[in-house]
Amino acid sequence: IDMQVVGRWAEERNIGFSTFADLSQRVEVRELIRGEIARINAFLPEHARVLRFANFPKELDPDEGELTRSRKLRRGFIEERYARLIDALYAGTQEVAITVPVTYQDGRKGTLSANVAITEVERAAAGSPRGQQARAAAQGTA
């Protein structure tokens, strides 16, 4: 999630949070993201739809090797560092505890431990009434 955008969204709705990890795991934020994924899923073929997702408990950072300087994912690094989370997405669990190393802005190193919720995205087939509603809403004709 984008901390500035989602943080502002949460503040406008009086949703309290203390950290990025806290904000990313709030039920309201997970529902916001779930709704957006479901809306986009309505346009995708069934085999390409997102079925489950998890919000990272921290922003991905080039200084930690997760992104290139041009902000592209370093997929191999991500797969290794977040293997527990990726495995949990495919295993069908509802939550996974992860611990990842972090580098603070002042150069100090530490770890972030968080329980990360895994959220199911409702499967609305494009031809179903719900899928048609989602498609119409996205096109502004609902």
Show which residues each predicted segment covers.
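AMP-binding adenylation
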Residues: 1-142
